[in-house]
Amino acid sequence: MRVRVDVCWTQHIFLFFVFGLSFMSFALSLDGDDYSKTGNPKALVSVTNLIYTRLQNLKTVLKADVDRDLGYCIKNLKGDWNEAFNFDKNLDFLSNCVKKNDGDLTLRLCSAAEIKFYFSSFVRRDEATTVHVKPNINCNLAKWVSGCEPGWSCNADDEKRFDLNNGKILPSRTRKCQPCCEGFFCPQGLACMIPCPLGAYCPLAKLNKTTGFCEPYNYQIPPGKLNHTCGSADSWVDAESSGDMFCSPGSYCPTTIRKVTCSSGHYCRQGSTSQKPCFKLATCNPNTANQNIHAYGAILIASLSLLMIMVYNCSDQVLATREKRQAKSREAAARHAKETTQARERWKTAKGVAKNQKMGLSAQLSQTFSRMKSARKDATPVKASGKSKDKKKEPSNLTKMMKSMEENPSNNEGFNVGTGSKPGKKPQAPKGKQLHTQSQIFKYAYGQIEKEKAMEQNNKNLTFSGVISMATDTEMRTRPVIEVAFKDLTLTLKGKHKHILRSVTGKIMPGRVSAVMGPSGAGKTTFLSALAGKATGCTRTGLILINGRNDSINSYKKITGFVPQDDVVHGNLTVEENLRFSARCRLSAYMSKADKVLIIERVIESLGLQHVRDSLVGTIEKRGISGGQRKRVNVGVEMVMEPSLLILDEPTTGLDSASSQLLLRALRREALEGVNICMVVHQPSYTMYKMFDDMIILAKGGLTVYHGSVKKIEEYFADIGITVPDRVNPPDHYIDILEGIVKPDGDITIEQLPVRWMLHNGYPVPHDMLKFCDGLPSSSTGSAQEDSTHNSFSNDLWQDVKTNVEITKDQLQHNYSNSHDNSNRVTPTVGRQYRYFVGRVGKQRLREARLQALDFLILLVAGACLGTLAKVNDETIDTLGYTYTIIAVSLLCKISALRSFSVDKLQYWRESAAGISSLAHFMAKDTMDHLNTIMKPLVYLSMFYFFNNPRSSFEDNYIVLVCLVYCVTGMAYIFAILYSPSAAQLLSVLVPVVMTLIANQDKESMVLKYLGSFCYPKWTLEAFVLSNAQRYSGVWVVTRCSSLSQNGYDLSDWILCLIVLVLMGLICRFIAYFCMVTFQKK
């Protein structure tokens, strides 16, 4: 941060150089006697012009000193000089003063030493804001001439030795003391004159006998001096201390000695040199200080609202039209495929009937005794047959197509459902990559589905892959096979040393549906999490082998599907949109669009979701599809990516029997294609029970009771003395026994069931479970002795801390684990996934238009309130009003930005665990939030700016607010990712207030000054003040320098402030992305 000199000292330096050096030229050129001796008006004009010309040449002399000492508040010396001392239009005040002083004007002007002494006195300032000059050679306790009074001045005593260039020695002044000229100001205690700047009104004061003040200034004539009268202005400092010198609001001062009231249709701010015309829709009466431009705010907000409504309606209409066209094309394709399939079936039936008739006729002819009789009998049927054949040929195109298919199954030219082309045009069915239009793609997809259905009916013993292969007549894409074997798998909670899964051995195989059952607390979900590589916070022992190799399951993440127990899907997307997004991001990047559509349509068909495919899934606040349909969508999200291993955590929970069977049939179709399916179920119905291939039953404590084929489960339990009563569902009976509701038959106990299974398969029995083996005495249990020692509280606390650190470390290692990819599947790149995410987030935002409109409405109200209440304060360059703006905009924009990442955390965790790009997810959300970054400053300023009407331009304010919103949005991302919604909202309210308070604290404290540099309100407020300060010139230049010096600002730092805000926003986004990846729960 730039180190500033004292506030007042800075002002002194500025005015010292401006006026001190300027009056050096007066001494070198002015000779007032030329006019006083002759009284010639031409001489007066020459003298006046000569003085003014010398004054204008000082810009070159002053440049180096101003750049060195006042560079923080004066960047354009020429421009600021002209704004303050360009008297080209009227030099009357100078001519009048030359005439009044009879040639001794030069002797009455302040020398360089006096100007320096005057401004150095500002270090001490009285509480009543009256400027006091320190005692000097002319004005002190022992000597006080009348020229020392405010508004008065005296001639220098020694005319010959008087030198305005002398900056060290104060000249003695005792002669010809009189009131100062109008257009000049004469400080109390100095006895010399300085010209007033443009924008000031410096007439001769008039005594108000009632108050005793010399109006319009705030000083009185000395008591007891009857001959003393009021003089001119007495000081020029900032607006707060010398506001009576400034041209009053509602008037303008073309010269420093003339004030004109603003006319109707114009407005004049304080310190104006000319009146400014009001805008057409603004109302400006005479003597108006600021124009009322509320109408333009209303027009702007109406335009923005209309634009947003148009964009929303048009985009919504485009989406609706696109969806309708898609649905129409899809329905037409489905109808076409069904009609074609039905026509094929009718042709097959007719052909079969004809063959049967021909075979019957041949048998009848073989039994005839007379050749003539047989000939007569044969003639009539042949004729009838010919007629029948002619009738069947009437629908010639369809008949030929069906006949061609039956005679040559390998030729698909007669059944080209993909394009609907006529027979004979193409010798081969079009593949997915050759299809481009939506109509062609849907015809291809539905044609394949209908053929698969027909093939499945005719070849019930064939696998689903075989059916697809026959239906497509192409080489079927084979999925990689995943077999998962586990040996002595044990999971132990860290810190508690409690087994949640113990000594589980077995395997789940491709092409089979394995069900995991057990009572509550048996570790079913933990078992699935261990298989899926998601178990953290525990110690794992034993082996998990993938296809016989000790590989991590994460190496097959791209072809592994995991369906969580909760329905983690996007409620503001339709069923089809949820499935389509998963398919796009997780299927092979080289797969054609038509094949992806075919896979999606297969899943929708198999899960029975056709009639709700275009319905929103729904959320807690907004109801959508039913719970059973939502559960099927939850499963379908994983099915569309064609997994080789599909793990489901209680997919049938909450479903009725029909929905459960529909879901399980869909899963069996996947298993027929070679998918390894493992799922947790709770007491399935007998029908569902028979649909499983393998069953894994766990007891409490994570011990295996049974793991094998469903066909052999009853036989096994019967062998150990557990038989299922009549009319009782076997799974229900086994669970009741494990829960302790039903006592098992015979002498066997629940604790012995896992040991019996281990002994049955020859697995080693843990030492502490040997007591449950049959025939062993209770004394030989070998159980470990209980630890009778008790740790102290501090030891327990330390152990808990260590455990939490280990669990956190384990979670971080899990999140950043990078296993070698063995799936042989190349998913879309980050760039392509980013496009998919942008499309998805765009749809979600359009469906949340009411929330967006509410955000804008709140911003409008805030802008109107703050614009009305926080009036422009020229004395402080409106610092306070901008402070309120920073707090309000930061708070409102942060709270609304929380929704970007706090609403769909669970969905992100699921997608990230499935291998979908986190970077694409984050960048797409941030990209769509840029619409708010652009629009919200416009919405707020449409009220605030036109109600407040500051001096700075609308464009400057908008740029600063855009950078501010970009910065605080990044901070909101961090809060949304790390904290719960309620905590994040509290932080979004607290942080702007605290940071603003820190940024506005006294800069003398180095700690607060250092902390303030890291607070975005400090840089935002500086940018606002600088954009406003640039508009203060002329008489305001000292106020500008004073305000910037007090706050430690520099005019050249405006761009720097914007860059810092943008950098803070970028850094916050990097931190937010890091937190999102690091602290996610996979």
Swiss-Prot record:
ATP binds at G518, P519, S520, G521, A522, G523, K524, T525. It comes from Arabidopsis thaliana (Mouse-ear cress). It holds the Pfam family ABC2_membrane_7. GO terms for cellular component: membrane; plasmodesma. It is found in: Membrane. Belongs to the ABC transporter superfamily. ABCG family. Eye pigment precursor importer (TC 3.A.1.204) subfamily. InterPro entries: AAA+_ATPase (IPR003593), ABC_transporter-like_ATP-bd (IPR003439), ABC_transporter-like_CS (IPR017871), ABCG_dom (IPR043926), ABCG_transporters (IPR050352), P-loop_NTPase (IPR027417). This is Putative white-brown complex homolog protein 30. Residues 832-1029 form the ABC transmembrane type-2 domain. Residues 484-726 form the ABC transporter domain. The keyword Plastid does not apply. One of its GO terms (molecular function) is ATP binding. It is a multi-pass membrane protein. Its main location: membrane. Keywords: ATP-binding, Membrane, Nucleotide-binding, Transmembrane, Transmembrane helix, Transport. Residues 329-437 are annotated as: Disordered. Residues 329-348 have a biased composition (Basic and acidic residues). It comes from the Eukaryota. The chain crosses the membrane at residues 12-32, 292-312, 853-873, 877-897, 958-978, 979-999, 1054-1074.
